Amino acid sequence: MKRNNHFENAKIISLDFKYNTEIETKIDNWKKENIFFGVFPTIGDSMTCSDLTKSIPNGSKVLVYDLQINCNTVLDNVWHQIPTKEPLLIIGKTNTGKEFFVCKTISSVDAVNNCVLLHSYNPMHQDNLIPFDWITNIYKVVQIL
């Protein structure tokens, strides 16, 4: 499997978890296509909500795969590839150099102003409008473990 630049020095560990044949097929396809995937922990309650079908509680682990969106280009070129209103793992770096790693949805894409609106499921957390050029990678959450 192709390693993503953000995880070059990461330790790879084996993790047993239950998944159905649909997920098994996806994992096999990611391996064949050399698409990065992994299991990551979530911290905080921003994605916790009363809808238990989508809630991602604090301390959950999520299975994700790299959407392979070229985040080094202007949003106008890739806006149609970005899933909206679906849980994503988003990695980036602010204009001051602070790295971030968040589990959010992208509720809207503004290609004119080159920014996206990050949304939390928890209504106690405000939406955040960020420049698209802060984002370095976008991963789609496939399963909450």
Per-segment meaning from a language model:
Residues 64-65, 100:
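Coil-to-alpha-helix initiation sites in intrinsically disordered, low-complexity, charged segments
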Residues 41, 89-91, 117:
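Residue-level detector of beta-strand face positions
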Residues 74-77, 86-88, 100-108:
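Short beta-strand-centered aromatic/proline hotspots
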Residues 82, 88-90, 94:
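Long alpha-helical scaffolds
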Residues 93-145:
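Glycine- and charge-enriched low-complexity intrinsically disordered segments
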Residues 62-64, 90:
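A generic structural signal for residues embedded in beta-strands
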